[in-house]
Amino acid sequence: MIEQKIGVTEMNLTEKEFVKFLSKFDEHPFDVKIGDEVSHIGKGEPEFKVIFHEIPSMKELLTSTSIALGEAYMDGKLEIEGDLYHALNMFLGQMGKFSTDKKALKKLIFSSLTKKNQQKEVSSHYDIGNDFYKMWLDETMSYSCGYFKHPEDTLYQAQVQKVERINKKLYLKEGMTLCDIGCGWGYLLIEAAKKYGIRGVGITLSKEQKKEFEERIKENHLESQLEVRLMDYRDLPESGLKFDRVVSVGMLEHVGRDNYELFMKCVKSIMNPGGLFLLHYISALQEHPGDAWVKKYIFPGGVIPSLREIIHIAGDHQF
């Protein structure tokens, strides 16, 4: 439902088409302001207002609604009056209504899964400098979902609790070997080495992460227990490494849908008999190629795995 509330000047055809396009996102009521015109979308009192100083073209919206609206906000052409998080949540909750021209955005949405390209994608995100990440991550430098036991928990507490929970689930014992695939800045392995006496290897494609992790190993005097390697998970089978435990936290999102089975095979190849593998990732109920704006500006090549596809593939490989 579209309701024109205020009108000082008549909307032109392009503006009317634009408001009509936005009208499908009507699960929550909101206002759209273009110039002096305010239109109401949905039923009930508006929960927020979207103010457009300049509207995207219909071609931009149809090519990628996500990129068109995301870049409009980045460029100051779009403002949210009200709760920004709520507005984002409302639009993203209706992502199925977004338009995406997969042919025009083929290279962005379905990027190459070769080692060379994935190394480039990881580097573009993680090698922009450790100082940048230290500005907004907690002291553990954990870059994956936290475990909030209580609403008032700090980010630091949530990350510590997450790692404690993971290490307990791994049933670690002194002298065991542990591989962390996509080890980040190393907090999980450092805690496992200090509290359980394990020997571990972390692998990452980020030179900056490797550098920081190596410094942390020295600071904690864990040189005899831990090492970090610049390595692609696909090189694990030929590495000669074997482990009692394998863990991967928030890395599967970088693997790519066509490589999930290969990932499981690589993990299986380095596990000792009776070993245990813990896999943590952001999941979705259904398969989706990923959001175009997120792929362009945040996680190049990133894909959210569905729960059902990973359970199916894991079962096929006796996990």
PLM feature segments, named:
Residues 1-159, 165, 169:
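Feature captures hydrophobic
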Residues 174-182:
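Conserved class I S-adenosyl-L-methionine
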Residues 185-196:
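Conserved SAM-binding loop of SAM-dependent methyltransferases across substrates and taxa
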Residues 220-235:
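Conserved SAM-binding strand-loop segment of SAM-dependent methyltransferases
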Residues 234-246:
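A short acidic, Gly/Pro-enriched loop at the edge of an enzyme's catalytic core
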Residues 261-274:
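A short glycine-rich, Lys/Arg-flanked "PGG" loop and its adjoining helix->strand segment in the class I
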Residues 274-282:
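Conserved beta-strand signature within the Rossmann-like core of class I S-adenosyl-L-methionine
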Residues 283-301:
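Short, glycine-/aromatic-enriched active-site segment of Class I SAM-dependent methyltransferases
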